[in-house]
């Protein structure tokens, strides 16, 4: 008899929550949920754009992110609340981030998705509160080439410094302050989408022998259980842990079912939470200790294997005649030279940055080495005798 085949309808249904349901439910139970990511992962931005209905249904009024500078909040509000979508105004917001390299279609699509969601909600229920996007980005004064006297920010040691303090620390205090003013004091809820390094809560990471400060650290000290950290699979820079998580998933009932797996879960009571972290260095409650995944994050979103990540696509025609002068001045502050850059040169800089996105992500696990065929060669020599 031929072997029995399992149809799609007969495969076991996973008891895990979908990542959208999980994130919406978590945001409904905590005032601030920090979602940590690497820069430029296409699938993750698509997921974020698709969570808006779940967020709104769970009472979340705000999506905060660091990919628009706070100085552009008025323009961001006008874009999201406009009666007609303005793709040019959206692109201009990302010109303000050209030096940091966020002129990508998928980031713009998140803003467009918020606009579409709010427009649909207004048509259905005029009293329903829209989702607001809160800008957390903090530019530095080294963007002005006139302040650098022909030298680069790197040469002057200023690239990571702002207002007399280290930029990572200053941006952390800035983001926490904005969230306090715009969310906490209003008694509202927010999903905060930031780079994974900015979302640490109880964990204090050490870089070059010194402790770091993140927006998540500050919020967690103020709010404790009111603040939770969620990370995407593969975003924490620990290759061995990423490999171990994928191994555990492949051995799970869902993994053996042969279907695509997507889920979100709390790590505290999960087997995945016990995965050891060997490449993340930091302290909990002031003491250095060996870390497990549940001590690095509260929640986990799995959309697929780390090897499936794809980089975002560039926004077409980001640089125009109207914004070229300001964009050129900002880039010349980062990479100064006597003569101004041309528009073609700025476009080439953007293309190079897009090609380098994947190189900045945590590395993939090394594939296992194939065994050497020594015995085969020995048999071949024996046969010749």
Predicted regions and their residues:
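Compositional signal for N-terminal targeting/processing segments
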Residues: 1-385
């Amino acid at each position: 008899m031929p072997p029995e085949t399992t149809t799609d309808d007969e495969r076991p249904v996973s008891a895990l929550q979908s990542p959208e349901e999980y994130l919406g439910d978590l945001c409904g139970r905590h005032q601030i949920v920090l979602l940590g990511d690497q820069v430029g992962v296409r699938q993750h931005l698509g997921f974020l754009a698709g969570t808006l209905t779940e967020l709104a249904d769970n009472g979340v009024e705000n999506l905060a992110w660091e990919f628009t500078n706070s100085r552009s909040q008025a323009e961001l509000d006008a874009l999201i609340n406009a009666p007609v979508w303005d793709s040019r105004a959206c692109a201009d917001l990302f010109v303000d981030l050209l030096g940091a390299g966020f002129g990508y279609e998928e980031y713009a699509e998140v803003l467009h998705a918020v606009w579409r969601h709010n427009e649909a909600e207004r048509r259905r229920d005029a009293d329903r509160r829209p989702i607001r996007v809160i800008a957390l980005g903090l530019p530095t004064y080294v963007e002005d080439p006139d302040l650098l006297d022909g030298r680069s920010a790197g040469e002057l040691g200023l690239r990571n410094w702002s207002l007399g303090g280290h930029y990572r620390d200053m941006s952390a205090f800035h983001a926490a302050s904005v969230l306090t003013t715009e969310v906490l004091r209003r008694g509202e809820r927010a999903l905060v989408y930031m780079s994974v390094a900015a979302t640490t809560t109880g964990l204090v990471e050490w870089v070059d022998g010194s402790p770091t400060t993140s927006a998540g650290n500050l919020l967690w000290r103020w709010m404790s259980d009111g603040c939770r950290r969620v990370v995407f699979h593969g975003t924490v820079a620990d290759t061995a842990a990423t490999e171990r998580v994928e191994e555990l998933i492949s051995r799970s009932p869902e993994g053996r079912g042969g279907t695509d797996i997507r889920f979100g879960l709390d790590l505290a009571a999960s087997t995945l939470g016990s995965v050891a972290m060997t490449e993340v260095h930091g302290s909990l409650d002031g003491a250095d200790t060996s870390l497990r995944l549940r001590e690095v994050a509260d929640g986990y979103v799995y959309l697929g294997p780390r090897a499936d990540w794809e980089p975002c696509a560039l926004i077409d025609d980001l640089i125009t005649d109207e914004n070229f002068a300001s964009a050129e001045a900002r880039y010349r502050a980062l990479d100064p030279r006597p003569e101004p850059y041309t528009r073609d040169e700025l476009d080439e800089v953007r293309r190079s940055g897009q090609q380098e996105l994947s190189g900045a992500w945590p590395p993939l696990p090394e594939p296992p080495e194939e065994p050497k065929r020594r015995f085969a060669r020995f048999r071949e020599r024996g046969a010749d005798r």
